[in-house]
Amino acid sequence: MKKWCFLLYVCILSIWLVSCGVGDLSDKESDPEELQSSESAIKGTNYVMATCTNKKCVVLYDLDLYDGENLDNCEIWSFAPASTEAYEGGGGISGVKYREDTVFGDVVIVCAGNGYAAIVSYPDGETLWETLDSGSNSHAIEILPSGNVAVAASSGDTLRLFASSAVLQNDTEKASVYKEYFLKDGHGVLWDPEYKVLWAVGQEDLNAYTVAGEGSDEELILRDDLGTLKPGLYGHDLSADFLDANYLWVTGGSHVYHFNKETGELSLDYEFGDKLDKPSVKGFGNNPDGSYFLTMPNYGVGTSWEKESYAGWSTDKIFCFYPGEDGAELETVKCKSETRAFYKVFSFYGKYQ
């Protein structure tokens, strides 16, 4: 009798476990919508985010899905402003970052050449803050630990700091207010949690700014003891080195530089420089797993958009570099899209450093 009771108990327990979804999940299909909002999607190390000039949007790719044919099949998330007003006067999205922000939560921050900038919640895509006054030909955006946003713009030679955090107190008027600083041909901006400074790169300056004040009273103070001046740099992109917190990556007109924060040196003597150092790189970065990625214009040769005005700074390929088994070599993978014209590419690692 006890034996039969035990067997009955086992059967009931098995049925309950299956009904609760516990058991063999090897053949269970994943819901794409669940994938976009899952922890693995947020933390994925082989994810990159790119700005698309022809579609005027940003796209998130899972490069593990790349089959060597069409990068479009790897798209798992995208964002484009709901209002066409965001694109009046032209200019696609030129800057984007993903941040695990302590003020707004997980966000994607974007800026566009016509002055549009926004904080967008991830993964639901809700616009939390936006402006059409980020600067003339805005190129890069960063969100500070305070929730305020900094935008570098090239044609206007500006670095603007917005009191965007005020929107959380429903003060939209104050959230649109900004302080402006001169930055010749502003192209890149990046917060550094180690040095507690905002880095910004322009035509020949790589500057570091201390943030003083709080909330809408925050302001930037230039540090004379950090940064560097390099005539002919033509700085373009600025990103963290996720393998060494003492370095930044800086792309220029002719090279990809490794910047030593402590010494202020822009160096071309770095590991894998024979593959990574290229001219006219628009977007560059790495991931904590040791992979690298970049975009550089190929003028859309052979694409449907090669005669468009933006072809001169766009490409249909994202170059990815993966460490070999011994770590001594980098494998190059050219991820090609059949429909997208890319400008910049960014790491989807949500930490600042």
What residue ranges belong to the model's regions?
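Conserved beta-strand positions in repeat-built beta-propeller and related beta-rich domains
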Residues: 50-54, 109-114, 150-155, 198-204, ...
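Short loop/turn segments immediately following beta-strands, especially the blade-tip
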Residues: 62-69, 163-170, 210-219, 260-268
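Bacterial Sec-dependent N-terminal signal peptides
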Residues: 15-42
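A short beta-strand motif characteristic of beta-propeller blades
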Residues: 72-87, 126-132, 173-181, 221-229, ...
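Blade-loop segments of beta-propeller domains
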Residues: 74-118, 125-140
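Bacterial N-terminal signal peptides
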Residues: 8-16
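Repeated scaffold domains used in trafficking and secretory/extracellular systems
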Residues: 86-99, 135-143, 183-190, 231-241, ...
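Residue-level detector of Asp-centered blade-edge/turn motifs that repeat once per structural unit
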Residues: 43-44, 100-104, 144-146, 193-195, ...
